[in-house]
Amino acid sequence: LIHKTFEGLAERGRCSMGWFFGFKLHLIINDKGEILNFMFTPGNVDDREPLKQGRFLENIKGKLCADKGYIGQALFENLFLNGIQLVTKVKNNMRNSLMSIADKILLRKRALIETVNDELKNIAQIEHSRHRSFSNFIANSLSAIAAYCFFE
């Protein structure tokens, strides 16, 4: 049923938990956990793709914390030219580069990102497979994100 519902829209993707069929939700939040911007992409889209689009990063300046999936020299340089410094942990196979103490402390905020994702999944119930139409999926997702804005 889900294949017919999202035919031509959703794709098979891979995450840390394994394979899935559906969409990825990309979030930009501030240091208080407030959602500044979000974007849905098919499951097979590279995590770095939304950051290459200007509209997703509109009005974003300063430091952008991300996980290891966002590491890429071209992306880092592109963001830097737009006034955004990408801060990520170093992959195991990478040379260790010097990181300021402030950036190391900032990387601890990754737990805040995971908390936002957890609340969207478990409290706002954004993740389920009972959608019967694409418009139902969008309505459910947008209402979950709007409801998150009222969480305390």
Where are these regions (language model features)?
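Polybasic low-complexity intrinsically disordered regions
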Residues: 1-92, 145
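Structural motif
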Residues: 15-18, 130-141
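Hydrophobic (often cysteine-bearing) scaffold residues that line and stabilize catalytic clefts
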Residues: 47, 109, 138, 142
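Helix-centered, glycine/charged polyanion-binding patches within enzymatic domains
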Residues: 63, 68-133
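Charged phosphate-binding loop/patch that engages nucleotide di/tri-phosphates or the phosphate backbone
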Residues: 136-152
